UniProtKB/Swiss-Prot annotation:
Gene responsible for this protein: hemL
NCBIfam families (alphabetical): hemL, PRK00062.1
Listed name of the protein: Glutamate-1-semialdehyde 2,1-aminomutase
GO BP term (any one): protoporphyrinogen IX biosynthetic process
Enzyme Commission designation: 5.4.3.8
Amino acid sequence: MSKSEQLFEKAQKVIPGGVNSPVRAFKGVGGTPVFIQKAEGAYITDSDGKKYIDYVGSWGPMVLGHNHPAIIDAVLKAVPNGLSFGAPTESEITLAELVTKLVPSIELVRMVSSGTEATMSAIRLARGYTGRDKIIKFEGCYHGHSDSLLVKAGSGALTLGQPSGPGVPADFAKHTLTCTYNDLDSVKTAFEQYPNEIACLIVEPVAGNMNCIPPKNDFLKGLRALCDQYGAVFIIDEVMTGFRVALGGAQAYYDVKPDLTTLGKIIGGGMPVGAFGGKKEIMEYIAPTGPVYQAGTLSGNPIAMAAGLACLTELSKAGNEEKLAAQTKTLAEGFKALADKHNVLFTAQYVGGMFGLFFTEQAEITNFQEVMKCDAAKFNRFFHLMLEQGVYLAPSAFEAGFMSLAHSDEDIQATLAAADKAFAQL
């Protein structure tokens, strides 16, 4: 029995399912989850001492690679001054200034401790600002685990929200309208049906929780226009895409300006940080300047602020944005070429520093329904064939993969060599 198997057996006795976030349990791909002992650069090492080229990157934050010296140095310098104060610090101002510089649509920003907290707070703010209750989200998009966002679509392109599982009251979920990603007509229908009731629309600009699905050319700008037409707050959820699709986020890449933006992952440099920000007139509706309440004991934590500032400062250096995108392109297109070589039905999609692998005959995947038609069983086999060769992909057919600046040309070529062998066995 491996050390990971022993640890998983032990963990299940004291932690629900043996993990602290469901996808880590490997239920989507089968087998025993890999327990990690340490990480460095593009590599993680498991409890048995086996090294893997890592394309999960802690689910996105590790854009510089693991254990980056600039971040470690910043954290070690901050720690002796105290771990938490519950009071304002200069470091939270400095990070906020950098965020507003990198993402011009953000005029004011509030720090929180997670992406879920950011999206939950942004939606509460939008409801308070507009005096409306209903919200629009998209089937297959994930915005954290708050009640109003754990809602699935019923039959048809548009439905009154239905809870995605136990614990979410139907009376609460009914305020969430679910539309089809990349389908403006479904959004128009929602607004036409409830023209004066929709507080906000929230969207992943690149859907990264049904693998990796970029928006169609007119989709995001069409959403912007509909929100303007009906007086709804337009929220772009950049928890995953922020600073990764482009330095200014997916909103910069696709040239669209939201009213509010949510951030997470990279903004903390590996520490637990989230943020939401946007137009001054909306953000001033949040306490203490406005009536919408939001608070957090560890919001603006000084250690997390130091890590986030170091990460964004390093990432902002000339050439890094282009390098990240180029490395991702090389990897994704390499996967596709190898699949073609072995006559495996396969499509790779990528934007900036994120990518998705789809086992399908379709040339392009554009929404949740198309994702569900992909061959998840074949992905699971591919995942384990890669894992055996020391390549750690996301353990789910429905999660995006992440490149880092630490991945070298040699790492990518080693990954593709492993993929060549894996595709040959499918």
